[in-house]
Amino acid sequence: MPRVKRGFKARQRRNKVLKLAKGYRGARSKLFRSATEAVDRALNYAFRDRRVKKRDFRALWIARINAAARINGLSYSKLIHGLKIAKVEVDRKVMADLAVSDPRGFAEIASLAKANI
């Protein structure tokens, strides 16, 4: 069986990993094995946290809506229930933004929900 030296392709593969590890501290940006471990871990965290970010933002929106709803004499769950009965389809992202930037507008939505409970 002939000997395979794996010159170009192996170097190309290693350089790809080292390029991804650029900016890491110490050996993690210089040595292929350390860089591979660091890059694999970083990509796993990135994949996981793209999903966690969605959960975190939804929790933030709910906390903001709840705070604004309580100022208007409702709990979060009562507000959402009232809006469902009134057939108002405003998503939580928009409602949270409204609660922060336009409290009067949010108060109108809250009064609409209150009327339909």
UniProtKB/Swiss-Prot annotation:
- Family annotation (Pfam families): Ribosomal_L20
Tell me which Gene Ontology terms the entry assigns under biological process.
Answer: ribosomal large subunit assembly; translation
Family classification:
Belongs to the bacterial ribosomal protein bL20 family.
Known function: Binds directly to 23S ribosomal RNA and is necessary for the in vitro assembly process of the 50S ribosomal subunit. It is not involved in the protein synthesizing functions of that subunit.
Q: What is this protein called in UniProt? A: Large ribosomal subunit protein bL20
Cellular component per GO?
ribonucleoprotein complex; ribosome
Q: Which Gene3D superfamilies match?
A: 6.10.160.10, Ribosomal protein L20 (1.10.1900.20)
Record key words, sorted: Ribonucleoprotein, Ribosomal protein, RNA-binding, rRNA-binding
Whose protein is this, by species?
Geotalea uraniireducens (strain Rf4) (Geobacter uraniireducens)
Superkingdom field:
Bacteria
PANTHER family per record: 39S RIBOSOMAL PROTEIN L20
A GO molecular function term, named singly, is: rRNA binding
